[in-house]
Amino acid sequence: MAKFETDVSLDELMTSLTSVDIEAIAPLALEQSAPIVEKKLVQLSEPHKRTGAMVKSIKAQKASKSGDGYSIFVGASGVDRKTGIRNMEKMAYLEYGVREHNQPATPVIVPAVRSTHDDVCDSMQETFNKYLENNGL
């Protein structure tokens, strides 16, 4: 059986945690960690560029709230002016391949998410810790 000691009672800890303003911290943590994924997506997409339109369009949007909580989109946006094809559509073709054109899948999204997972979690934890320090919790 595990045993631990603490200087804070469970009631004090719960009171401190319930005073955390999730509405303020969640979007901030997401927006501060998004550039990590953005940089990796650009790095992995760079070798596959033809015109550079898709790679240049990779950006992080602002955090948004839905019924499930906060989320943030990092990826290609907009439309290629020359071809009229949406940049996210190009990224999907790259990720999954196109059978009709014998284009093999060369994933960039899944490897970017997997390789940045730990750094993103560390960044979000750091943001949370700074929030706690600044608010004396």
Regions found by a protein language model. Give the residues of each.
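Short, Lys/Arg-rich flexible segments
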Residues: 1-73, 92-137
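A short, structured beta-strand/loop element
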Residues: 77, 81-96
